[in-house]
Regions:
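Conserved NAD+-utilizing ADP-ribose enzyme module
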Residues: 1-57, 66-161
């Protein structure tokens, strides 16, 4: 599982995106299955780790210069950060689209921050997976699916003089 998180966090952000999306989706679905089995485990470290890693609540995804949302149901990066400015690459003055979705108990997200916290608590208190700048993003891994979208907000670029 650690290698999957490492590969996910360290993929390039620019370009055409991730490869092998179906395979990656299968991995994340398996991770959710495994973590759900931990929820009722008598092993306290497993049951508590599940609480850290499975994410429910509002999440947002920012697309730059997006005309239309492609609901492809693939797992992608979302954020639980309150301030979008915490996304190191985000420029609020450029044109962008903000998708807001709801991760639920039936359809949870996977919290990268929660994974890091669980590893720190139960395995290695010095564990790091990403840089402080990326850590502020509070990444949640969640599928891009129309049924989970609460709102779509399109922002035009600000004209600078």
């Amino acid at each position: 599982m650690l290698e999957l998180f490492r590969n996910w966090v360290n993929h390039p952000k620019e370009g055409r995106g991730r490869k092998n999306l179906e395979q990656t989706d299968d991995y994340w679905k398996k991770v959710i299955q495994d973590i759900r089995s931990w929820e009722n485990s008598e092993d306290e470290s497993l049951s508590e780790s599940a609480k850290y890693i499975l994410y429910t609540g509002k999440i947002r995804r920012v697309h730059l210069d997006l005309d239309e949302v492609n609901y492809n149901n693939h797992y992608v990066s979302w954020t639980s950060a309150e301030k979008l400015e915490d996304l190191y690459w985000f420029d609020p003055s450029s044109a962008h689209t903000i998708l807001t979705a709801e991760a639920t108990i039936e359809n949870p997200g996977i919290s990268v921050k929660g994974f890091i916290e669980a590893v720190k608590k139960f395995e290695d208190k010095n564990f790091e997976l990403n840089s402080p700048a990326i850590r502020k993003e509070q990444e949640v891994i969640f599928p891009l699916q129309e049924k989970s979208i609460i709102s779509i907000e399109k922002i035009k670029s600000e004209i600078r003089i």
